[in-house]
Amino acid sequence: MIMRQTKLYPVVMAGGSGSRLWPLSRVLYPKQFLCLKGDLTMLQTTICRLNGVECESPLVICNEQHRFIVAEQLRQLNKLTENIILEPAGRNTAPAIALAALAATRQHTDCDPLMLVLAADHAIANEEAFRDAVRGAMPYADAGKLVTFGIVPDLPETGYGYIRRGDVVPGATDAVAFEVAQFVEKPGLETAQAYVASGDYYWNSGMFLFRAGRYLEELKKFRPDILAACEQAMRGVDPDLDFIRVDEEAFLACPEESIDYAVMERTADAVVMPMDAGWSDVGSWSSLWEISAHTPEGNVHHGDVISHKTENSYVYAESGLVTTVGVKDLVVVQTKDAVLIADRHAVQDVKKVVEKIKADGRHEHHMHREVYRPWGKYDSIDAGERYQVKRITVKPGEGLSVQMHHHRAEHWVVVAGTARVTINGEVKLLGENESIYIPLGATHCLENPGKIPLDLIEVRSGSYLEEDDVVRFEDRYGRV
């Protein structure tokens, strides 16, 4: 197969708000934005995995409420180039990939670019094997095939869908791909054992490679309603900082469907490229334990942990010391506002705990005590009747919106850095150990004019203290 000169356009799916890694994963800060292995988040690791593959800057698709998290993580990699598509609501993978394909064809009018579709929350141990599989699949995709990457199974996993391979694709290169004979739903154990023994089945990874135009052609053939809704949503694109904000009303009218059901199971041009790269979808605490580095006792430690007579356990300490004595096969995860203790073999039921938290009207499933904003972050240290205490960190050169509150007053004490505070038009500079009072109803603004982070303690007092008591008059992040 001879490839034409073409451009490879990575598309990273960063939607979703999974509950299986609670309490680390929350609705407002799901697992793809967490550092679970090493210093990079799962999203950042997914992007860096492409180092060594010649490609364009990635296009990331995410939920609107995660936009500033994604932007900051791309900025840290120097990959922020107006390349974030915001979904007003999740509509599964077929519509999301359609938005990316439409964006890619708009941006690259001189060619039909190859789209490498990746999930932001997968772990891959052998990254060179991953890159080899991508390079091997490119000639097939360039020739018009829709490539799905099939993971070579090393055990009879019942939690994944499978792909049964057919004949070798004619004209195969050194990297052999197979026609897709069948997509199979998650099997029972005996069936999965037979699949693995046969050598004809792969795990369905949810990673794809195809030309943007070919995907749109097949989507038009099999699900024209999805394509029409996405085209309408892209016609109403509203550029917003580094974001591509599609028309909300049009996209909400789009049917919800996966790419497997909408296209891959119907097209005559689906091929599977085998990949043996130590892949995991990190779908539970037990799978994270399996892919992490272990102590001689089989334990995985994160943070300040001391274990004694402990075996085959995962222990995560976010804040403070966590100790274990005389236990085995446990998952212990401690965050600032919640602790999970579970049998490592029963972690599939963590989602039931999350459902209970949600049903009880609590907030621990939704957000962490520490919350990230485009200007920095805040940590809710304490709260009681008619008061809240927060530690606020503002990044250098950033600032909060010009705002006012109907139901609360605020006291600010600068801990580190310099604060520029505007209250009812009067500007004051505050240094360390200086404080200021913001009366109820006052129009005010907080900025960091310095070169180091600004840290301050905020004490709120009033009859209603939640975040939605805010009226914004000006905002550099488009939140007015």
UniProtKB/Swiss-Prot annotation:
Q: What does this protein do?
A: Involved in the biosynthesis of the capsular polysaccharide colanic acid.
Reactions the enzyme catalyzes: alpha-D-mannose 1-phosphate + GTP + H(+) = GDP-alpha-D-mannose + diphosphate
- Kindly state a single biological-process term from the GO annotations of this entry: GDP-mannose biosynthetic process
Question: Is Transferase one of the keywords UniProt gives this record?
Answer: yes
What EC numbers are recorded for this enzyme?
2.7.7.13
> Do you know which SUPFAM superfamilies this protein is assigned to?
Nucleotide-diphospho-sugar transferases (SSF53448), RmlC-like cupins (SSF51182)
Q: What GO MF annotations does this protein's record show?
A: GTP binding; mannose-1-phosphate guanylyltransferase (GTP) activity
Biological or metabolic pathway of the protein: Nucleotide-sugar biosynthesis; GDP-alpha-D-mannose biosynthesis; GDP-alpha-D-mannose from alpha-D-mannose 1-phosphate (GTP route): step 1/1
What's the protein name? Answer: Mannose-1-phosphate guanylyltransferase ManC
Is the keyword Nucleotide-binding in the record?
A: yes
- Give the species: Salmonella typhimurium (strain LT2 / SGSC1412 / ATCC 700720)
Q: What family is this?
A: Belongs to the mannose-6-phosphate isomerase type 2 family.
Query: Gene3D superfamilies from the xrefs?
Result: Jelly Rolls, Spore Coat Polysaccharide Biosynthesis Protein SpsA, Chain A
Give the keywords, sorted: Capsule biogenesis/degradation, GTP-binding, Lipopolysaccharide biosynthesis, Nucleotide-binding, Nucleotidyltransferase, Transferase
| InterPro entries xrefs | GMPP_N (IPR049577), Man1P_GuaTrfase/Man6P_Isoase (IPR006375), Man6P_isomerase-2_C (IPR001538), ManC/GMP-like_b-helix (IPR054566), Mannose-6P_isomerase_type2 (IPR051161), NTP_transferase_dom (IPR005835), Nucleotide-diphossugar_trans (IPR029044), RmlC-like_jellyroll (IPR014710)
